[in-house]
């Protein structure tokens, strides 16, 4: 049986490390959102409560949604709730195996990315070529621990506020 890879992301970050502002994404990048959907479709996704709350439509269709929350009364429709990251990863891996998926995606927020980066085998990272104002930042990534396996650059345009590069990194 193939192993199930834990991934950090897809995650988009500005040059200054910003990943969010006021509970939303501080940019409009339709091309990146399409990539997010393509990468996560059919795979379990793990997110924190604030990320869940920020979703315009809940749950994310076609994916098992797992939400971390310490609030015992939190019962989101269409999601599994876990109190601990390890428990969420175990449940997600079991679900991935059942679904025939080969990855589990940790999709946010910042503290969950920090937890995921310690164990992830792959990172789906969108680097936005701009400094953006925001109130949530990603811990700087030590890229010496990772090797880039793909990168594709996109220009700013009608559907995308800024130029950006979608990258895939794998642990060395």
Feature roles, as predicted:
Residues 2-172:
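Flexible, gly/pro- and Lys/Arg-enriched active-site loops
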